[in-house]
């Protein structure tokens, strides 16, 4: 079976999903992705396009690469990742520029655009587009039951949608040893180390994070912040207990998980929440905003806590009421929850069955 994955961007969880799927020996995989992000994709067969942002020249480059690649290669399945790739390819089908009958078309939005906290008229436009283009799709993959419900509520046929959780990989002896060492690490520290991983934007709740930092006692916590803004201007808090690391390579993240006691995830919306699952795999409990899909990826009270991040004082009050020993006691439960519920093999098998079924 020949499968081509098409992505306008592979940042974050998109790259993880594509890499997990293209490792499968049953499938001959090919990936179209941005040249600037190609190092994040491990598949040997890649076709690259020039991307400088979400602009006309970049989308035109992607459009031409898609047309050329599909013309000169034979694929059984086209797997579209995220909204822009989903729009371009399915629009080509709708306007008969590509023969839809030649392919099985799978679409993973990695968070529908209409889930975003945006203006009502924009949501209506996004919903209309997704409903129209669903006709050019054999199967739509929701990464959580929350995303599934949003899609059905938007008028997309539930018969078109399958739920497949994203996954974390337990492959490799080195990774297993690191997880074990991470769970055994209970060094006595003066402060609780708090980790944040994500873009500095509204979706990821960066403003909520800053509000928590401003209220929290400097003597009790160190905040380690991984990520950056998608824009040039953002508020950077200057306090002695706050450290900014910028973006780090995915392969380096485990070291940061092992050095921190708790992950903060104040997102306003998520279709899944991969960072929370990865953190728990390394025994790091999560304090997350009680919204969207996050209740599906955290076991409240067992592997972390679901709270309302709109009230920074309340969040800090909850943090203050628990010692580092309390968080350390959750390590094993975190690891078991993540490794049992979000297995890479389960995710890959689900996708392979979907490829074969349509």
From Swiss-Prot:
InterPro entries: Glyco_trans_1 (IPR001296), Glyco_trans_4-like_N (IPR028098), Glycosyltransferase_grp1 (IPR050194). Transmembrane segments: none annotated. GO terms for molecular function: glycosyltransferase activity. This is Uncharacterized 41.2 kDa protein in cps region. It comes from Klebsiella pneumoniae.
């Amino acid at each position: 079976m020949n499968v081509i994955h098409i992505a306008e961007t592979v940042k974050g969880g998109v790259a993880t999903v594509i890499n997990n799927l293209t490792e499968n020996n049953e499938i001959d995989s090919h990936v179209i992705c941005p040249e600037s992000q190609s190092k994040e994709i491990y598949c040997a067969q890649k076709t690259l396009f020039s991307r400088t942002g979400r602009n006309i020249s970049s989308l035109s480059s992607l459009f031409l690469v898609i047309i050329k690649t599909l013309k000169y290669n034979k694929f059984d399945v086209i797997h579209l990742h995220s909204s822009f790739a989903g729009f371009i390819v399915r629009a080509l089908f709708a306007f008969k520029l590509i023969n839809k009958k030649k392919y099985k078309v799978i679409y993973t939005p990695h968070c529908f655009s209409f889930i975003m906290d945006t203006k009502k008229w924009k949501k209506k436009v996004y919903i209309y587009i997704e409903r129209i283009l669903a006709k050019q799709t054999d199967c739509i993959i929701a990464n959580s039951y929350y995303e599934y419900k949003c899609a059905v509520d938007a008028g997309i046929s539930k018969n078109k949608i399958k739920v497949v959780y994203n996954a974390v990989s337990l492959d490799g002896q080195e990774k297993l040893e690191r997880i074990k060492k991470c769970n055994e690490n209970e060094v006595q520290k003066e402060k609780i180390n708090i980790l944040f991983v994500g873009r500095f934007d509204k979706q990821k709740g960066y403003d909520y994070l800053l509000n928590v930092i401003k209220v929290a006692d400097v003597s009790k916590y160190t905040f380690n912040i991984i990520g950056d803004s998608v824009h040039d201007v953002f508020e950077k808090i200057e306090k002695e207990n706050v450290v900014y690391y910028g973006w780090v390579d995915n392969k380096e993240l485990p070291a940061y998980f092992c050095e921190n006691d708790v992950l903060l995830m104040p997102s306003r919306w998520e279709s899944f929440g991969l960072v929370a699952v990865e953190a728990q795999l390394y025994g790091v409990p999560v304090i997350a905003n009680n919204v969207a899909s996050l209740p599906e990826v955290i076991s409240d009270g067992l592997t972390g806590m679901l709270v309302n991040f709109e009230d920074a004082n309340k969040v800090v009050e909850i943090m203050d009421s628990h010692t580092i020993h309390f968080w350390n006691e959750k390590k094993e439960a975190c690891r078991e929850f993540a490794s049992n519920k979000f297995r890479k093999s389960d995710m890959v098998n689900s996708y392979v069955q979907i490829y074969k079924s349509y």
